[in-house]
Amino acid sequence: MEATSVFRPKLGSQFSLPSTTNLFPLRKLYGFPLTSFPGKPIKRIRLKATNTLTFDDKERTRKFKKLPLSEWTHYFHSIPLDISEMDALKEEIDELKPKVKNTFMSSQGSDSTKTKILMIYLFVSLGLAYHFEEEIYETLKEGFENIEKIMAGEEDLYTVSIIFWVFRRYGHYISSDVFQRFKGSNGSFKESLIGDAKGMLSLYEAAHLATTKDYILDEALIFTSSHLETLVATGTCPPHLLARIRNALSICQHWNFEVLVPLDFIPFYEQEKDHDEMLLKFAKLSFKYLKLIYLQDLKILTKWYKKLDFPSKFPPYFKDRCVENYFFVLPVFFEPQLSSARMLLTKGFILLGIQDDTFDRYASISEAESLGNSLKRWAPDHSMDKQPEYLKSVLKVILDTFQEFEKELSPEGRSYSVKYTIEEFQASSKANVELAKWAQVSHVPSFEKYMEVGQMEITACVTVAYILMSMGKTGTKEAFEWLKSRPKLVQSLCTKGRLMNDIAGFEDDMSRGYVVNAVNCYMKQYGVTEKEAFKELRKMVVNTHKTLNEEFLTTTCVSHYVLRETMDFARMIIVTYNGYEGFTRPDEGKIEEYMTSLFVDHTLKML
């Protein structure tokens, strides 16, 4: 096979080396185990390659894709905000909250716990769970102690599926054997279930909480997906339920942002005949208040961002994504009281974007090495004075912003969190330099070697560190040490982030001649087509879903809150790369639609 036929399209020079090359020795640099990924037997391919690596470090006309500035920043910087409206909403919420709580806690009868669990699902879906965290915790703790009694004799598919979903969502390991009751004598799910559209949808949602050993949930996903797709195609159920099924097939509730779910669920619930008017009103008030809090945050954040004046300091190679970055922190910190955490994490994301774009899209090798060395020293290296002004600005904004973090967190006695996060940022920068060297000479390493470096370059570890840094006292030293140990949950996050980014960003990478990508590395190593590579990489992504679920349920060395926010980061990855590159091209997928719904639209009419 000719080397030039392995990659499509042929853009610039294609360069690779056999996997035995010692020019890029495989080192355990980043704490990841050097295990092989599943794939086909290696098939040797002849590649056109030079004998030595050469770097052209002279100033030259750079080839980079100019990225347009975001229109969102100016919009929120100048938008008016009515504080009196926020105060009025808060007053109504405070008046209704105890009434809703009383309805939840006063459930009586033999099925009272079951009724409460079903209501917890409504709380989560309507965006209200944060109002009743203690009550939910106590209810599920008590319920889990009596799970066998609760499930005994329950034959309603919707009820069993929702109870399963709620317990697993909150970290309680309920066995998937509860679904055996819905199988016939032939070992397959009963055909009679097909007529229960809500039950089928709930089983479909429950199947996404599968672990690596929940084979019955694999069967359930196949069974429900095919029949739900038929329902959508034929339109044979109520329109409001049909819309919900269509949304679920696009992205299941478990892997969606918790704050995005109410956008669809509130209108759905309103059209349910048995909906609770008080609960519906409480959901609408809470969601409207939440949106106003976000506007308040964005006014403050965009003011900070505009003062930095990045467009005057950097060439237009970087992704101008202040408001978009704020959107991407919402799966982790969406509750109204967490404004400070959102601000901190958004600023961290902005730094990661500048770092990544500088290494990935613009810097020469000497510039990349100088920036990498400076970040390693956490001060300008000896060559920085000779570098272009833009690079000095990149380094300055990173160092200054971390100094800002230190100033904010030091009074809380949390300087250690900044130190740990800097270490992860430095490790990420080191990986960026390695990838930049490969990219500039179109070197395509083995898949395993690429993943070792690429998993760190994708910034999943430093993102978890940012999350811990932003969490307040819950982000303990022990939590950071857990991160440093590279537990299986974190490894799966890194794999998921790397693969989903590379799958969704493949077209963009190739269009600019950037061949260092998991797809190309897999094609080269295993001698497969692009289509086959995509198929295998997507299988790996699905496996990470199951591993994440499993680790969330079984990890005991850190707090549930840390695990929950880490899982929320996984949700960010999935929504961002759900069939499109949502960060680089937010206008081409659903990201812009989501942002408009959360930050601009006020379509949830009040009762």
Curated annotation (Swiss-Prot):
Which residues hold Mg(2+) 3?
N501, D509
Which residues are Mg(2+) 2-binding?
A: D356, D360
GO cellular component terms given for this protein = cytoplasm
Q: Record-annotated residues binding Mg(2+) 1?
A: D356, D360
Query: GO MF annotations for this entry?
Result: magnesium ion binding; terpene synthase activity
What tissue expression does the UniProt record report for this protein?
Predominantly expressed in roots but also in stems, leaves and flowers.
**Pathway listed for it?**
Secondary metabolite biosynthesis; terpenoid biosynthesis
Give any Pfam family that matches: Terpene_synth
Q: What is its EC number?
A: 4.2.3.-
Q: Which cofactor does it need?
A: Mg(2+); Mn(2+)
* Position of sequence motif DDXXD motif: 356-360
- Subcellular localization, as worded in the UniProt entry: Cytoplasm
Instruction: Cite the CDD domains for this sequence.
Output: Terpene_cyclase_plant_C1
Cofactor detail note: Binds 3 Mg(2+) or Mn(2+) ions per subunit.
> Per UniProt, which keywords does this protein have?
Cytoplasm, Lyase, Magnesium, Manganese, Metal-binding
Give the domain of life: Eukaryota
Q: Which GO terms describe its biological process?
A: diterpenoid biosynthetic process; terpenoid biosynthetic process
Function summary: Involved in terpene biosynthesis in roots. Possesses diterpene (C20) synthase activity in vitro. Does not seem to be involved in sesquiterpene (C15) biosynthesis.
Family designation: Belongs to the terpene synthase family. Tpsa subfamily.
What does the record's free text say on domains? Answer: The Asp-Asp-Xaa-Xaa-Asp/Glu (DDXXD/E) motif is important for the catalytic activity, presumably through binding to Mg(2+).
> Which protein is depicted?
Terpenoid synthase 9
According to its UniProt entry, this protein's organism is Arabidopsis thaliana (Mouse-ear cress)
Gene giving rise to this polypeptide: TPS09
